[in-house]
Amino acid sequence: MEMKLEVVALPVSDVDRAKAFYSERVGFTLDHDVRPNDSMRVVQMTPPGSACSVVIGEGLPLGEPGSVKGVQLVVADLDAASEELSARGVPISDVQQLGPEGARGSRFAFFADPDGNTWAVQELTRGPRP
């Protein structure tokens, strides 16, 4: 059986603020911002190059704002990605080496959205697999 992850739901307290953060600062593509009915709003955005999107909204059972931890993005060049995110106004950690030097995928940086949902940005290198 083949399965693909389609959407990650992020609980936020202010949809417009989160939409601006993810689309304008982080650089996600806005897929849609719709109101299926008077009590619901669904905003879906996709990271560039990703097949999986994030959804935020109103009237959705998404949990407490800021409760999602450790969503992960993968990039080819972490230094460049960190510089770009920082230049766009995203507070991002220093690059951290979390495994042996040269190990596949051992470099990370971290950021949070305005509600405290946290993200890891991982550099996927061509080093040996563990």
What role is predicted for each listed range?
Residues 3, 32-34, 41, 73, ...:
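Vicinal oxygen chelate
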Residues 14-15, 75-79:
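Helix N-cap motif at beta-to-alpha junctions
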Residues 1-19, 68-71, 122-130:
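N-terminal beta-strand motif that seeds the catalytic metal site of vicinal oxygen chelate
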Residues 21, 78-84:
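Short amphipathic alpha-helices within nucleic acid-binding modules
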Residues 58-75:
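Helix-adjacent hinge/juxtasegments
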Residues 48-52, 62-63, 78-80:
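Short, charged/polar surface micro-motifs in flexible loops or helix N-caps
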Residues 2-3, 9-52, 87:
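Core segments of cupin and vicinal oxygen chelate
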